[in-house]
Amino acid sequence: YRRQRQMCIRDSTTVSLIRGVLRGLKDHGYKIGGFNAYATSDVLVGAGLSSSAAFEVVVGTIISGLYNDMKINSVEIAQISQYAENVFFKKPCGLMDQMACSVGGMVNIDFKDPTKPIVKKVPTEFEKYDYSLCIVDTKGDHVDLTDDYAMIPSEMKKVANFLGEDYLRDCDSNEFYIRLDEIREAVGDRPVLRAIHFFNEEHNVKNAVSSLENGKFVEFLDAIRKSGNSSFKYLQNVYTTRDIQHQNISVALALSESLLRNYGVCRVHGGGFAGTCLLYTSDAAD
């Protein structure tokens, strides 16, 4: 699959991202100006592959090079890109996609202070272990799924607020489980399940990073498997409940598990609900 197109000034989506990045750069005190650009990309649009984040970062990097002597660092470009998507594109995304695109490679990010995120590169020599990272296009897209995405942080914050905090990361998981009945009664079961995913995922991420840093690839795969299962069962971002008859990702995951067996792991990729799956496959599976 390959897509080529010349950016059109009448394309409101593209224009909103460009204008948002330029406004953000200007507000941060950087010089801005015009430029002509032609883009060729293999990134699937609306499939959970950070296509909008990648585009925002490209625009920011172009302006950094043309007008600011390439002095705008990758973290600031990511933050400005997020601003463009939140304010101009009207999508309530976090900072993860933009940061991954801007910094590059596999990264571990701590977002406790969004103004000063802690970013650490993680080694990713998959070929060393005879494994490949694959993306499976399930032929769905993210059109009209903004509300589904927005409900995830909204529901998690309901649980955090019940426990007296703004964010789940500041909550005591032991208190959460002790008061589970109260929380279920107050906010409902889906927010509770999504909170359980959050607490699980904090451990999964730490285990995945530690495993890669210490060359324990089997443990890394186990962390990815647990993360994917938690996303499906507790975060519930594999399909939209507004269209239960179309579950492309669910079917793709079922088939992938059946085909891979012990030769790899799979999980939903990106924001979920539609789009792509992520697979780590053993070269021996060929």
Q: Predicted segment positions?
A:
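Single conserved hydrophobic/aromatic residue that forms the stacking wall/gate
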Residues: Y1-R5, I9, Y280-D286
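Phosphate-handling active-site elements
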Residues: D27-F35, I63-I77, S282
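Glycine- and acidic-rich phosphate- and metal-coordinating loops
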Residues: L22-L44
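Glycine-rich, charge-dense phosphate/pyrophosphate-binding loop(s)
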Residues: V103-M106, P114-P117, L180-S282
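A short glycine/serine-rich beta->alpha loop
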Residues: R10-D11, S41-L49, E85-K90, R194
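Beta-strand segments within the central parallel beta-sheet cores of soluble alpha/beta enzyme folds
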Residues: G34-T40, K71-Y83, L221-K226
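DPxDG-like acidic metal-binding loop motif
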Residues: L49-D69
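ATP-dependent small-molecule kinase catalytic core of the GHMP/sugar-kinase superfamily
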Residues: G65-N214
